[in-house]
Amino acid sequence: MAKKAKYPDVPIRFSETFSDTNLYIVLLIGVPLYGVITSYLFNREYAESTLKNLLTIPVSRISLIVSKLVLLLIWIMMLTLIAWVLTLLFGLIGQFEGLSSAVLIEGFKQFMIGGALLFFLVSPIIFVTLLFKNYVPTIIFTIIISMVSIMVYGTEYSALFPWSAVWVIASGTFFPEYPPEYSFISVAATTVLGLAATIVYFKKIDIH
């Protein structure tokens, strides 16, 4: 909308709007926002001192983590869908050009891929939350992640940094210096390591 107001003679296309919005979500907004939700979900029992009581019920620690991950997935994908719908509505209100079923499907696909991959990458954020049992370190950690993602954006190194690799994968903008497999491996390795660290730490930690 701002671009259209500044350059009224330059048409704004839906494809660019979907792509730019998803870029902002993946690199700038998504990680801190989902980090806050993650921190709340996994730190709430610590903050309210109810985790020990919760674990007295026949619920394993792994089951507790899985249930919270399912809830987190629902939150992330729901917010991603809302962002896609709002982008479409703003485009219709602003009378952007180039709307077609192909553009809608491609935009929806990019949003969903970005949301799903960001969900996978919350595992290190969960570990930081459990480690410090406080919201502040988690928020700082996610802000640092976003800053690094923005710093490497547009360079070939964005294909290697897990959180910026999400955008590379979702948009299909791979770099000739690094095959697509590098981006997938970066995301997968970070996810697995973060999840493993979370499970091992949560199983061994003493609950007071």
Swiss-Prot record:
This is Bacitracin transport permease protein BCRB. Part of the binding-protein-dependent transport system for bacitracin that confer resistance to this antibiotic; probably responsible for the translocation of the substrate across the membrane. It is a multi-pass membrane protein. One of its GO terms (cellular component) is plasma membrane. The chain crosses the membrane at residues 23-43, 70-90, 111-131, 135-155, 159-179, 182-202. It is found in: Cell membrane. The lineage of its organism: Bacteria, Bacillati, Bacillota, Bacilli, Bacillales. It comes from Bacillus licheniformis. Keywords: Antibiotic resistance, Cell membrane, Membrane, Transmembrane, Transmembrane helix, Transport. It holds the Pfam family ABC2_membrane_4. One of its GO terms (biological process) is response to antibiotic.
